[in-house]
Amino acid sequence: MKLAVLYAGQGAQHPGMGKEFYESSPAFRAAFDSAALDFDLHRVCFEDPDGVLNQTEYTQPCMVAFACGVTAVLAEKGVKPAYLAGLSLGEYSALQAAGVFTAKQAIELTAFRLSLIHI
């Protein structure tokens, strides 16, 4: 049987997403940490005390960092999807999962994409 993975776009985020993976998986932690930007991803994704996770400039990097972490967990477990797809922003995560670019590059491209949205 072949496996397909569909990466979510903006709108699937919620406070606490990825926290259990981060605490239990070195692969998730390494991928997530490589996505560092100019704000505290951990605080926004895991706690969101300021309620900013639903603001686009935070949502998109958090979603991509989370997806990169999940991709790392799948790889760590030997799961190799035959098909990858992404919905809107999820396309960046699917491309990262396909090896087109690294987790850090996916985050950098997401940040660039955000800069274009705010022009």
Residue ranges and their predicted role:
Residues 1-117:
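FabD-like malonyl-/acyl-CoA
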